[in-house]
Amino acid sequence: MADPSDIPSGFFISTSTNNAIAAAPAIGFGPAAFGTVTQGTSKSTTVVVNAKAGTITMHAASLATVTSVLFTCTNSAISATDVVIANQGSGGTAGAYQVACISVGAGTSVFRVTNVTGGSLSEAATINFAVIDTSAT
């Protein structure tokens, strides 16, 4: 059997039941689409990273137990209709933070990071993010 990854993008297979199977290009981003940034001054400081995917290293300031902080990410790769997904990366205590992108606009997004542990944390947690293009064109 052929490796499905060998099927070229846009290749269609018709079946006897009139169903079509289409091969799509690989999902993901190459190195050129990846960016990194380190937050300066505090956990609420705005960061600038112009990339479709990447890692944000937060400032190591203290974040009290069950407390949230918001910060803006300026990013020219984001359109107003895009979806930004985020999760805690490998930096910081595993499972200690709840991470969400709570707002998206043209060239900007807002992240909320919550310390979900029973104690204060002072570490440079990392956030991995990806921008999903949802434009109709």
Q: What residue ranges belong to the model's regions?
A:
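Surface patches in mature domains of proteins
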Residues: 45, 92-104
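Terminal beta-strand-rich extracellular "head" domains
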Residues: 82-92
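Extracellular receptor-binding modules and their adjoining Ser/Thr/Gly/Asp/Asn-rich linkers
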Residues: 2-78, 104-137
